[in-house]
């Protein structure tokens, strides 16, 4: 990472952090909440959500480099985000953030226009990079949103259980969530928890005069909410006992604002598989995610990469 900053924004992962993240996003995966699960699976302890450290990168930038995320700019919005998880994060780990300017967009498919692109690394108390990625800020137009993807009816009946990585695209879970109406508590709770005091989220007078005409929900929160919806479906099926579903990384695009009172549904499906070159007994599966509002408009889309047990070659 060229010309990176000194570490900023020190924050220790606590039980309360994990509980609050789960409550705000609906990600109640056993590995984060069962104190016996991680040690029994050889994880070395109870691990935090990957997206806890990923999301916190935006909070740290908001606190220590606010121009990188447009804090206080009525015309700017976070257009895209990418994250890669390199190491497990445990209760008691101490995060800090290093960031640098770049001229590469965080993800593909962003609308043309002037951007502020930032790469980041989240570093633990041992100097190890646990999380890395990029965020793109823009004052340009919104990209054209795709149509909501078709998600066929799915049932695990008839699927070859356990479902290996090789079988995910054909047999893996896909669907549409029950939906969630965005509340005042969601927006304020996330902004305060993650350290994102953007007036676009919290200040009605500022937001009413801004580009979207009202306060919006933090896009990092809406993506985490969609991830929680998808993950519940994924973890409802049997997968191989060799290895476990490891979260490798994500990316997302902001396509339209989400307001308090909007109802959003998550659509998701597996879209690709490739065998791991370094661990041939494992495969990498990509899942597509869309968040769709009550008017049928896709407001955010993204990809999730997971590593899972594959069939022997």
Feature map (PLM): residue ranges:
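Hot-dog-fold acyl-thioester-processing enzymes
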Residues: 1-78, 142-249, 313
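HotDog/MaoC-like acyl-thioester-processing domains
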Residues: 1-7, 85, 89-172, 254-313
